[in-house]
């Protein structure tokens, strides 16, 4: 868009309402989208910021089956949780809607019928797996079988979660239905397709020629798809959960979720403008103005897994309908990893937003700051709890918070919290004021180009400027001999803080609001920033408070331990179980004398790493056993433990020590050893069998 927009429509990818939101969602989509929306509002722009829950599709039905409830109960539960979590983090949607609403069903049905009646679809019949017992066609995730790549017997019809291979249902060996356990059959089914190949020439021109300014990761992925050639894509599927296909002969079919979900942006706008008072907030515009007028700028915020849908498929849908505007930009981010590993909801490898908000009360801005500072803007990035702690302690506390606290505390100490007058300026003052003037424009330029990490860095540089100014001028040292000079220093320091309150609002809005209150700063917008006229000499400041506090090591260690426990649980859940050995006769088994013994002494065997010399009380004697467990247990820690002893194993000499038996151990998935022992203390010598 070359001309200045009259309004902005900002959408953020609709999260699936089959589970809570995690930091990957936030870093990739919602924090940058909120920064952009808040920035534009601060500039006085007419903004519609749309969010909502994606409540249709197979992931919802799978979750419902897992929890033993209906799909509607699943989406009702998670929609509320997701919406509340976003509100608590300060994601400032104008509306957070949902695709199970009546208005969405009506909107997406009307959209489908318009394209259907205009002849934009093609009909195709294909063979698909069908479960005769359940009387249902099977989506990819409703089929499991043996992976042809690694032999995993529980691979899904679209992916093997063990080896990560992408699959199709027809590739599975011995496929079976997850609904009934029966072997599915192939059955013909008719569906409607959007012929993307017909839009390929237009898409190549629109994306590759007209939008070369898109982010390199977005442009590159689009080019790859277009170079491979586009194929017709089904807009309907056989499923009992979703928006019913609104044409005759389509019983048992619903709109494919990729088709109905982006229409959710449009239905959300319709829903929002049902309230007649809303129009006044948006300069008497209507929902159509935000979706159909050429002077509207449409921006989609998404993660990289949604690039094809928002850059190729949804634009083709909009083009086919004919009356809607097309996106001006789609600044998709890459993925945020967690402690060096890919975030995975199925493995519970995530930092969940609702848990963070509970465990780090009042620290919404710390998370927002850390995620923006490390945002995966053009490549995957990694969230670590140590980096989170460092961002808080070394930047928010030591720079931003320290500067603001110094300026306000010194003003309170010397002038009873009354803003002192600006006196004669020295060269250093004029230099600082000149630098101050540049910051709003620098930050704005970065935000407008979707470089949010860079913009955040400039915002923090303004705090650094204030910190350095106070450190260089040292007003606490010269107050007695030159109080007039201190008035000027603190006046400028407070003006920098006021500017900081304005330009930090898109990034850390809770902190900005506190700073506005502490400075008694009246409603000021972005356009006022860059001056030293925001505060008036003689005005009273509010009460100073610490904006940030240090996060201690123990707090971080608890979070790291939580993740380590999750990793161990995953190892156990996915451990390979060794196959059974050959059968033995009962008579052979009966020959083994296995009994409970108690360890009464333990010591390391000299010149070895793995061996412990154990003295055992067996109930019939005390004996020595040499065991290879030294790397797993400290000798003094196991004295008094009861163990299982194979007591009639023939003695043998190990490192000069005669070992009379063998301790039975279990090896865990992570290679650690555990004693096989009774659940409660029993008499030494008690038989096992």
Curated annotation (Swiss-Prot):
Localisation: Cytoplasm
Coiled-coil zones: none
Location of the tRNA-binding domain: 588-689
UniProt key word Calcium: no
PROSITE patterns assigned to the protein according to its UniProt record, in alphabetical order: AA_TRNA_LIGASE_I, TRBD
GO cellular component: cytosol
Positions annotated to bind ATP: 345
One of the record's GO molecular function terms: tRNA binding
Catalysed reactions listed for this entry: tRNA(Met) + L-methionine + ATP = L-methionyl-tRNA(Met) + AMP + diphosphate
InterPro entries: aa-tRNA-synth_I_CS, Anticodon_Met, Met-tRNA_ligase_1, Met-tRNA_synth, Methionyl/Leucyl_tRNA_Synth, MetRS_core, MetRS_Zn, NA-bd_OB-fold
Keyword Transmembrane helix appears in the UniProt entry: no
Entry's EC annotation: 6.1.1.10
Subunit structure: Homodimer.
Family per record: Belongs to the class-I aminoacyl-tRNA synthetase family. MetG type 1 subfamily.
PANTHER family associated with the record: METHIONINE--TRNA LIGASE, METHIONINE--TRNA LIGASE, CYTOPLASMIC
Name of the protein in its database record: Methionine--tRNA ligase
Gene transcribed to yield this protein: metG
